[in-house]
């Protein structure tokens, strides 16, 4: 057996239906495109969201909001993420990056109070919610906003 002798199993691959090859094929004459109209013509298709000339839905809806170009996006760390660190250790942005909790280089790191903290830590982050600060201090640790 050679590579050029390999063939797929019988019936495992269907033949492509060739259109426009006579009326008895079932796909002759109009080749499955229907009668006249834009979709029967050659030369491309309509753009996404095109409704035949009717005002499309995305233009009927009112504009809303804007994107602030000066917005700062922070990497989010929750309290339950900090349980992987040893009791009494110091958690900085560098230790968060080396542990894989912070992947992207953003404006900084923000600590949020989702979950429960079970270890005593010294946390140094750019921002922290009030609830997160209280939870870290309740566990015996401190939060330092840098």
From Swiss-Prot:
<dbReference type="GO" id="GO:0019843">
    <property type="term" value="F:rRNA binding"/>
</dbReference>
<dbReference type="InterPro" id="IPR005749">
    <property type="entry name" value="Ribosomal_uL15_bac-type"/>
</dbReference>
<comment type="function">
    <text>Binds to the 23S rRNA.</text>
</comment>
<keyword id="KW-0699">rRNA-binding</keyword>
<protein>
    <recommendedName>
        <fullName>Large ribosomal subunit protein uL15</fullName>
    </recommendedName>
</protein>
<dbReference type="InterPro" id="IPR001196">
    <property type="entry name" value="Ribosomal_uL15_CS"/>
</dbReference>
<feature type="compositionally biased region" description="Gly residues">
    <location>
        <begin position="23"/>
        <end position="35"/>
    </location>
</feature>
<keyword id="KW-0689">Ribosomal protein</keyword>
<feature type="compositionally biased region" description="Basic and acidic residues">
    <location>
        <begin position="1"/>
        <end position="13"/>
    </location>
</feature>
<dbReference type="Pfam" id="PF00828">
    <property type="entry name" value="Ribosomal_L27A"/>
</dbReference>
<dbReference type="InterPro" id="IPR030878">
    <property type="entry name" value="Ribosomal_uL15"/>
</dbReference>
<dbReference type="GO" id="GO:0006412">
    <property type="term" value="P:translation"/>
</dbReference>
<keyword id="KW-0687">Ribonucleoprotein</keyword>
<dbReference type="InterPro" id="IPR036227">
    <property type="entry name" value="Ribosomal_uL15/eL18_sf"/>
</dbReference>
<comment type="similarity">
    <text>Belongs to the universal ribosomal protein uL15 family.</text>
</comment>
<dbReference type="GO" id="GO:0022625">
    <property type="term" value="C:cytosolic large ribosomal subunit"/>
</dbReference>
<keyword id="KW-0694">RNA-binding</keyword>
<dbReference type="GO" id="GO:0003735">
    <property type="term" value="F:structural constituent of ribosome"/>
</dbReference>
<comment type="subunit">
    <text>Part of the 50S ribosomal subunit.</text>
</comment>
<dbReference type="InterPro" id="IPR021131">
    <property type="entry name" value="Ribosomal_uL15/eL18"/>
</dbReference>
<feature type="region of interest" description="Disordered">
    <location>
        <begin position="1"/>
        <end position="54"/>
    </location>
</feature>
């Amino acid at each position: 057996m050679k590579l050029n002798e390999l063939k797929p199993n019988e019936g495992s691959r269907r033949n492509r239906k060739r259109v426009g090859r006579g009326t008895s094929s079932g796909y002759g004459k109009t080749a499955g495109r229907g009668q006249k109209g834009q979709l029967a013509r050659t030369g491309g298709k309509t753009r996404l969201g095109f409704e035949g000339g009717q005002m499309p839905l995305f233009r009927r809806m009112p504009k809303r909001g804007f994107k602030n170009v000066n917005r700062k996006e922070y990497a989010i760390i929750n309290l339950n993420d900090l349980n992987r660190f040893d009791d009494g250790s110091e958690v900085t942005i560098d230790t968060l990056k080396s542990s894989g909790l912070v992947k992207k280089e953003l404006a900084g790191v923000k600590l949020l109070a989702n979950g429960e903290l079970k270890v005593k830590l010294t946390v140094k982050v750019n921002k922290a919610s009030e609830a997160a600060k209280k939870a870290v201090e309740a566990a015996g640790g401190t939060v330092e906003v840098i």
